[in-house]
Amino acid sequence: RQQARAAMWKIIGEIDEANQEALLEALPPEGWFYRSRFGEGVAQTAFLIVQHSDATLWRRFLPVLQPLVASGEVDGEAYGLMFDRLAVAEGRPQRFGTQVVCVDGKQVVDWPNIEDPDNVEERRRAMGFTTTLSEYQALFADYPPCS
């Protein structure tokens, strides 16, 4: 089972790398695939390619994406997810609480690792999140046990 999992992740990694190269080659001069110009599908696909890459691409694109949230060219929840993913990778607190941790076999919101937790719900609302952190936590209730 472990051998099959390793083989699967190797293939996924190769596909991710090819997708990242293709995205960078196709990147328009304005620096992102705007929804209004390229459509929701292209914008979402580009986001997912970057989201499933590494900190190097997250650092490159977060400053490009952030101002596009206000104009509606980029989804605020998606931006928050990438922002938090980079923060966790760099050992910094999350701003929106999107990255969960495994505690006692359950996926839970990492409350101790949230920047200014008293104002996290306000930040989430301002960014366009559709759930509170409690509602987000509830989404993980039926997940299989983690380790």
Residue ranges and their predicted role:
Residues 55-58, 132, 145-146:
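Secretory-pathway/luminal and periplasmic proteins that interact with or process carbohydrate-rich
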Residues 66-126, 130, 139:
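An amphipathic alpha-helical core segment
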Residues 34-37, 131-137:
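Short, surface-exposed acidic
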